[in-house]
């Protein structure tokens, strides 16, 4: 069960974690869309694995499925993975008039994670070109080390690891409250990602329930708390009940993002 409690959190650190895990979920959605369009050489995401080291504070996120294109960009001669992860405004998620089903941040997202990290590492396998790419970023993204590119016959995946700059966040290290928030956020992703994708946190599978069942974690079973639940659209699921806290509360997600402050959708 999910328990309501007061906790101390650092919004910037939480957002860095959120950016990484939403990227994993976004990748699963995009590849599914490509498969529906019958594009070739698409391997779907089947696993998302999140690891948070409680001692060192290092965070690692991995998803399988198509990796990043391991090739040099024709215009600026930079490796595409370095552009995506290490240079601002280099994604393709810019069209404001386009209906969005992903939670990307218009080219800023993971670069900001690295700016607030002592170091970060990326690794990806491009099964189409048969290449594995690894690269390290240090000192809050001021130092971009030379990538290692080699041949590979492995299945595709992308993995990112980073050590947040806890001092910049006014912290001595990873706290118990932040660790638990990261764990809870991983559970969220498990329920807003397609059921064909297995989600793990520190090696253990998280419950990949439907949204109605996920409500039980917050408010208890139907026999305990009466509620109404509807799916008016294939991209909308809504549940409501009397608040157990005797005041208005809400839990909501939009394109995988936890909208903890609500919004027009609420």
Residue ranges and their predicted role:
Residues 1-6, 97-105, 249-260:
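Short, conserved non-catalytic motifs in the polymerase core
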Residues 1-17:
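Conserved short strand/loop->alpha-helix "switch" segment adjacent to the catalytic nucleotide/phosphoryl-transfer site
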Residues 1-2, 54-55, 151-161, 238-254:
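Flexible hinge/switch segments at interdomain interfaces of large molecular machines
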Residues 2-6, 24-49, 91-102, 123, ...:
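Active-site phosphate-binding and catalytic loops of NTP-dependent enzymes
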Residues 19, 23:
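Conserved polar catalytic motif of the HATPase_c/GHKL fold
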Residues 25-92:
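Conserved beta-strand-loop-beta-strand hairpin that lines the nucleotide-binding pocket
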Residues 55-77, 94-219:
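GHKL-type ATPase core
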Residues 197-266:
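GHKL/Bergerat-fold ATPase module in large chromosome/replication-associated machines
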